[in-house]
Amino acid sequence: MKAAVDLKPTLTIIKTEKVDIDLFPSPDMECADVPLLTPSSKEMMSQALKATFSGFAKEQQRLGIPKDPQQWTETHVRDWVMWAVNEFSLKGVDFQKFCMNGAALCALGKECFLELRPDFVGDILWEHLEILQKEEAKPYPANGVNAAYPESRYTSDYFISYGIEHAQCVPPSEFSEPSFITESYQTLHPISSEELLSLKYENDYPSVILRDPVQTDSLQTDYFTIKQEVVTPDNMCMGRASRGKLGGQDSFESIESYDSCDRLTQSWSSQSSFQSLQRVPSYDSFDSEDYPAALPNHKPKGTFKDYVRDRADMNKDKPVIPAAALAGYTGSGPIQLWQFLLELLTDKSCQSFISWTGDGWEFKLSDPDEVARRWGKRKNKPKMNYEKLSRGLRYYYDKNIIHKTAGKRYVYRFVCDLQSLLGYTPEELHAMLDVKPDADE
């Protein structure tokens, strides 16, 4: 009987917690006075806000704002923020930080998004953005084509701030067969920066990649169709159709048979291609919201060096090549492993666990576990380790993007044309980072 009496005050406290008092600021309240959200209060806020967010539908209809945030222009993003500011009496919102289109906004990821806004404001805006994206998501039809998603989506060239990203792309749907990869740098074909900038995403769900007819005609290519079979971990190709395990590995999926496999898929030229740069596996989970829709060819003006030269938020305290800035420049959306490695390699504070060797684009993982830990933190994959990270690196071998240096442990080399893309020679980067050639060299 006593236990029942003790339980009543606890239940009463939970039931009488006021959402409008604890969670919503009054018009004259400064953002600094708003208490930090707890997991329980965030859940309550989520439930309370859903009803309020429904009012945005009228604003969308009035201003012609697309239902899918991925299709928003910079003007649509600004209108959305303005609506939220007026609806919730938000303060401390810097509209200049929203100078991007919807695709870039959605690609930021939650933590990066929240870093740009005051605590409470960021949670409200992110909650609404997630709801809008989930409402727009449609189940992928069995016959293969998702009409709700266009084949092309443009991304912003303003995507400059770097932070944690939750999205990750997947590798191409199928190789024709495994091939032997040489580790000799001298035997590689050159890879042009134009190939990197002609990247396409795999669409949500089953992977069917099509080139535009004009683009196809301009390349000497060989085509192949998707094989209806389960892919082994060796070739690191993953589908989007189902979640599963292969050979005891909890980080790979199987490819389901498709009804329509007679369509031409990803083309491969006689030389190595950067097409694969957008399709590094995310290893531990494949949630549908982690996959952006297909992007068009994106060819920015100038080099990455030109792109960031006058950016105010590029300073000595940040890496020379922030991964998110590089992702925005190339139009890749979510940060990829090769971009993340370049970020670490151009950050002086990371030289204790990853650094250039001083020999061109060669680099060494002095502490591979720390590199893997940071990659897992960036991608919100707590189970990430070097074994899983190395699978991603091995995937790059086949595309002549990164190769393992023979005879050296944890030593790799970028073998693609980074100089044309970045606008930096390796020697320039070494000088900026005070890199000294390894004594072993």
Curated annotation (Swiss-Prot):
**Region entry Helix H5, spans:** 426-432
Q: Where do the segments described as Helix HI-1 lie? A: 304-312
Regulation of activity is described as: Autoinhibited by a module composed of four alpha helices (HI-1, HI-2, H4, and H5) that flank the DNA-binding ETS domain, reducing the affinity for DNA.
Any GO BP: positive regulation of endothelial cell migration
- Which cysteines pair up through disulfides? They are none
Pfam short name (any one): Ets1_N_flank
> What role is this protein assigned?
Transcription factor. Directly controls the expression of cytokine and chemokine genes in a wide variety of different cellular contexts.
* Subunit and interaction comment: Binds DNA as a homodimer; homodimerization is required for transcription activation.
Output this protein's name.
Transforming protein p54/c-ets-1
Species of the source: Gallus gallus
